[in-house]
Amino acid sequence: MEKLKLTIAVTGLNNTDNPGPGIPVIRGILESKEIKARIIGLAYENLEPGIYMPGMINKTYMIPYPSSGTEAYMERIIQIHEKDPIDLIIPNLDAELYTFMKSQSKLQELGIHTFLPTFEQFEERHKANLDKFGEKYGIKVPHSKAIVSGSDIKKLENEFEYPVLVKGKFYDAYVAYNSDQVTNHYNKISAKWGLPVIIQEFIKGTEVNVVALGDGFGNTIAAVPMRKQFITDKGKAWSGITLSDKEMLRITTDLISKTKWRGGMELEMIKTNSGDYFMIEINPRIPAWVYLAVGAGQNIPEALVKLAMGIAVPPYTTYKVGKMFIRYSWDLLGDIQEFEQLSIFGEIEK
């Protein structure tokens, strides 16, 4: 059977100790037996390691940050598309998703496919809305509160017991054991990610995660649970192992069925010593550890590409339990000419 030829643009090429999902997504796509992909990298910084990794990306273009505004952002995407036609874009960072969701119809007119959550799905799972989300869908969640001012911190003792988690609206989470630490983390997070900052009840237990893919009609196409075995100081998994956990899969399939989730997602949960599961976060895109799912037998990036292109995908029903991943540091060597070309012209071909 002839492979489906596609030009696929991917973001999230940072592959350091705070990795983006871009390279794992690309690896999954390149391993597909049914898709022959030409990969375009969309980079925000000219030192994102994924740009220079051999065998991953055919051509990289620099793009502005989403904070530059939807119009400027999409103008650059269209400019790239006119020069180098794109069949599909896979945005992999939370901060980009709103811009791409808002521009879906425009992209579709240009022949650029996406496979993203709806606005309602994206908004209701926000950390600030987690209490309502849990109540609506029958999921246990820790108590959360969004704060927008330093004066709100003094009132927290009326609602929370220390320690608490202090979270950014997109990224970052810190444990605080008193109000001074909350203030510290609040200032750091709000300066980086803006407001609100979310205060969340601290649940004792083991953190477990699920990477999943919904087809938009309530069907779970893929779901693989794992436990982080080593976590960096940024809270990212440095190693992990797939689990046999029917309850995690039940929670996932039930949630996708009720929400009719469209696209990739990551569910972050805490399993308590008594066996209860608390949903602490729902990330509306594929996580950076997705290649573990590929290795376990569920090629989620490949399935997402097919769904985006209107190809029916039967649900995965099995995966390998006990499959592990370990991240490592590796020095890539390159020439200054590559860096200069990217800096001056905003593009580079490998």
Question: Language-model segments: what does each one mean?
Answer:
Residues 1-115:
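ATP-binding N-terminal substructure of ATP-dependent carboxylate-amine bond-forming enzymes
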Residues 43-48, 94-96, 120, 216-219, ...:
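Short glycine-enriched loops at secondary-structure junctions
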Residues 121-204, 216-218, 246-249:
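Active-site nucleotide/adenylate-binding loops and adjacent lid/helix of ATP-dependent enzymes
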Residues 180, 184-188, 200-260, 264, ...:
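ATP-dependent carboxylate/phosphate-activation module, predominantly the ATP-grasp catalytic core
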Residues 275-277:
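Conserved protein kinase catalytic/activation segment
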Residues 302-350:
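Peripheral (often C-terminal) accessory segments that flank ATP-dependent C-N-forming ligase machineries
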